[in-house]
Regions:
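Residue-level detector of the transmembrane beta-barrel scaffold of outer-membrane proteins
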Residues: 1, 26, 37-41, 59, ...
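Transmembrane beta-strands of outer-membrane beta-barrel pores
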Residues: 2-4, 33-35, 42-48, 76-82, ...
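Extracellular loop and loop/strand-boundary signature of outer-membrane beta-barrel proteins
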Residues: 8-16, 43-48, 93-99, 108, ...
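Surface-exposed extracellular loop regions of Gram-negative outer-membrane beta-barrel proteins
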Residues: 16-49, 55-59, 177-179, 185-188
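Hydrophobic, lipid-facing positions within transmembrane beta-strands of outer-membrane proteins
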Residues: 21-27, 42-44, 56-60, 97, ...
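Residues on the lipid-exposed face of transmembrane beta-strands in outer-membrane beta-barrel proteins
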Residues: 25-31, 60-64, 111-117, 126, ...
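Gram-negative outer-membrane beta-barrel transporters
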Residues: 31-38, 126-130, 150-243
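Outer-membrane beta-barrel signature, preferentially recognizing the C-terminal barrel domain
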Residues: 51, 65, 71, 78-132, ...
């Protein structure tokens, strides 16, 4: 009891605690020419919650601007994420944490092409992420309806993705402040992972992701200070959920279905 600590504002005491310290050293160098920008760096990281010594995480970024409006870019980065105290010790309310979780490691490669002018901006991006010891909360329904959510490490998860987006500013293109459509934006992204969901296993984070996402946005000038904007998106998520009937679990998993959502807003600006 001598080691307990009062909870501020409550008639309660902390009975367990943990301290950890993070040490980071960064070194980076940047080179800039008229059309070329490049930078390389490394981070040395040590956390007292990890038995390892200092680990080094390099990163490289480069871009090349050509033909005035085009830019080609590429990047490589690596990183570390320590498990949170919740992931390590939260074992109440249907959760069972693992105090022996390892830190997440991530390596990512990204490349893309951008075209930009005052009235248009378009980007194509490709990326690849290699994650090891990725942390997730999972639930195994083969253990029954009362199965707990357990924190765990996944050995490896490889993620591949593509993104395409374009934005057109009609006010700048037509040099007309009163044009009905002020701007329009289109974007599409696709992600695929090589780690598949196991049978009867429900994932809360690592294995649930948006495989497809398509978005259309537009801003409109209606009359004087009256404007509107609208956004429509269609999403297809990978993952599943636990089916309940009459507030009781059926211990069955149901895959998410694609859905779409439309948002719209009117606004008025006085003194237009």
């Amino acid at each position: 009891r001598d080691n307990t600590k009062k909870v501020p504002g409550h008639d309660a005491e902390y009975k367990k605690g943990l301290n950890r310290t993070n040490y980071s050293i960064f070194l980076e160098h940047t080179y800039e020419d008229r059309n070329i920008t490049a930078s390389a760096g490394v981070a040395a990281v040590k956390n007292t919650g990890n038995s390892d010594g200092f680990k080094f995480y390099p990163g490289v970024n480069a871009s090349w601007r050509f033909l005035g409006n085009w830019k080609l870019y590429a990047a490589y980065n690596s990183s570390l994420r320590m498990p949170t105290f919740t992931e390590l010790y939260y074992s109440v309310g249907g959760h069972a944490a693992d105090k022996n979780l390892k830190a997440e490691k991530m390596q990512s490669v990204e490349g893309g092409l951008r075209f930009s002018r005052p009235w248009v901006n378009a980007v194509v991006t490709l990326f690849y992420n290699h994650g090891s010891d990725m942390i997730d909360w999972t639930k195994d329904l083969s253990e029954g309806a009362d199965a707990p959510w357990r924190s765990r490490n996944y050995t490896k998860i490889n993620t591949f993705g593509q993104e395409v987006s374009a934005r057109i500013d009609f006010v700048s293109m037509l040099v007309r402040d009163d044009f009905f459509i002020r701007n329009i934006e289109l974007s599409y992204s696709h992600i695929n992972q090589d780690k598949k969901l196991e049978e009867n296993i429900q994932s809360r984070y690592a294995l649930e992701y948006l495989r497809h996402k398509f978005v259309v946005k537009a801003d409109f000038h209606i009359w004087n200070g009256l404007c509107a904007n609208a956004s429509w998106r269609w999403q297809d998520r990978v993952g599943n959920y636990e089916l309940f009937e009459n507030k009781v679990s059926t211990c069955n998993m149901v895959s998410y279905k694609p859905y779409s959502l439309l948002d719209a807003r009117l606004s008025w600006t006085s003194g237009y």
